[in-house]
């Protein structure tokens, strides 16, 4: 009996303990559920607030984009109007420059004076001996942009006695490209269609010339060495060191070019620096000997390029940053250009500045390289005044 009572007491005690633990567990779970419900309610509240802020931000962004779109349209309209006004001003400037050109800087071989007394002293026989070619530029007739190929600086030119085009990409390399025609160059993707020509020594600057099947270039060496390269036989035909002490650029705005080799109707020439001015040398295209030298008195400052037509040097000037290029200094080795007929030519505004200008006497065109663009300028020529009216005999 006692055992039964003891067993019942133990059973009741165990049941009471289990009830206590169960109640504690339920209380814990209930508290955790309440905490989770509070967190969920807080998350919902924050989510609603974030959604509200996002909608407000989207509305503000949409309003701002709409305002920016209106401002952009207005700015574009203003820029188009400004561009039209600038074009109109440039056309008016072209007209004014054509009608009232400022007096150019003209230099002649012997400091020519235009007085009648001096003119009468000149002999007619001497005049006809010197003037092998008697053309002078009167104006730019047309401009054509062929394509854009390669580096901002370079050179392209054509041998006057063939249809081949030669491209020098950059200012220092030993590789150039030959194209059989203008059409082949125009249709080529880059220089892919060109024939690659590798010369023994790297060329320097953009002062190269192609004349009668030969390439004449300044070698990139410690000396100012002219290399004559046979384009037919792919071999060096001759070399010569120019007797020039200065290694300054011949044109201030193109510091890579130390000497500019030029070919025209009368043969091969070299333009080189001498102090603050540009000097000219007539070269024998066969032996590379220097036959005669002149001080053109054309300043190197702000010069970007030059070209020669019929023994007359035309130096092209610009500004930094680039503006409109212009011929502002003319030098005639035949002493046949007067102040009144020396042209002051403005080139159309383009992309940057000329890194090279090469004249083709057969086509009467300039091959120009401007910020990677290959440009052709068609020239209008006329007879020099003294060719039309030679000085009288004594």
From Swiss-Prot:
> Is tRNA-binding there in the keyword field?
no
Major place of residence? secreted
Q: Give the signal sequence positions.
A: 1-18
Please report the stretch or stretches of sequence annotated as the Olfactomedin-like domain.
Answer: 132-383
Q: Which GO terms describe its cellular component?
A: extracellular space
Q: Give the record's GO biological process terms.
A: signal transduction
- Which locations, inside or outside the cell, does it occupy? Secreted
Q: Which InterPro entries match?
A: Olfac-like_dom, Olfactomedin-like_domain
Sites carrying sugar chains: 169, 204, 233
Q: Which domain of life is it from?
A: Eukaryota
**Pfam families in UniProt:** OLF
Question: Where, if anywhere, are coiled coils annotated?
Answer: 29-94
Q: Which cysteines are joined by disulfide bonds?
A: 133-310
Q: Which UniProt keywords apply?
A: Coiled coil, Developmental protein, Disulfide bond, Glycoprotein, Secreted, Signal
The record's function comment reads: Secreted scaffold protein that plays an essential role in dorsoventral patterning during early development. Stabilizes axial formation by restricting chordin (CHRD) activity on the dorsal side. Acts by facilitating the association between the tolloid proteases and their substrate chordin (CHRD), leading to enhance chordin (CHRD) degradation.
Family to which this protein belongs: Belongs to the OLFML3 family.
**What is this protein called in UniProt?**
Olfactomedin-like protein 3B
Identify the species of origin.
Danio rerio (Zebrafish)
């Amino acid at each position: 009996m006692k055992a039964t009572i003891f067993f019942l007491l133990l059973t009741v005690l165990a049941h009471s303990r289990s009830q206590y633990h169960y109640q504690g567990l339920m209380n814990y779970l209930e508290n955790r559920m309440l905490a989770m419900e509070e967190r969920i309610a807080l998350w919902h509240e924050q989510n609603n607030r974030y959604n509200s802020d996002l909608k407000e931000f989207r509305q503000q962004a949409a309003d701002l984009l709409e305002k920016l779109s209106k401002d952009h349209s207005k700015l574009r309209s203003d820029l188009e109007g400004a561009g039209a006004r600038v074009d109109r001003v440039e056309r008016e400037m072209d007209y004014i420059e054509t009608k009232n050109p400022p007096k150019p800087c003209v230099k002649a071989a012997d400091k020519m004076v235009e007085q009648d007394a001096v003119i009468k002293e000149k002999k007619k026989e001497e005049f006809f001996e010197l003037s092998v070619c008697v053309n002078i530029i009167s104006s730019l007739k047309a401009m054509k942009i062929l394509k854009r190929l390669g580096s901002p600086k370079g050179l392209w030119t054509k041998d006057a006695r063939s249809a081949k085009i030669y491209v020098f990409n950059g200012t220092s390399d030993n590789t150039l490209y030959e194209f059989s025609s203008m059409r082949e160059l125009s249709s080529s993707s880059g220089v892919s269609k060109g024939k690659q020509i590798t010369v023994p020594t790297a060329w320097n600057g953009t002062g190269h010339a192609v004349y009668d099947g030969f390439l004449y270039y300044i070698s990139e060496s410690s000396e100012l060495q002219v290399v004559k390269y046979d384009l037919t036989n792919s071999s060096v035909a001759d070399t010569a060191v120019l007797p020039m002490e200065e290694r300054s650029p011949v044109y201030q705005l193109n510091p890579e070019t130390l000497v500019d080799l030029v070919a025209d109707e009368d043969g091969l020439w070299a333009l080189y620096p001498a102090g603050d001015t540009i000097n000219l040398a007539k070269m024998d295209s066969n032996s590379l000997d220097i036959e005669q030298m002149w001080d053109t008195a054309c300043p190197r400052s702000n010069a970007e390029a030059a070209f020669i037509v019929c023994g007359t040097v035309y130096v092209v000037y610009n500004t930094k940053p680039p503006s409109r290029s212009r011929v502002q200094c003319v030098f005639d080795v035949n002493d046949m250009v007067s102040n009144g007929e020396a042209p002051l030519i403005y080139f159309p505004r383009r992309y940057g500045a000329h890194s090279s200008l090469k004249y083709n006497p057969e086509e009467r065109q300039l091959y120009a390289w401007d910020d990677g663009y290959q440009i052709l300028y068609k020239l209008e020529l006329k007879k020099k005044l003294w060719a039309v009216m030679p000085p009288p005999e004594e």
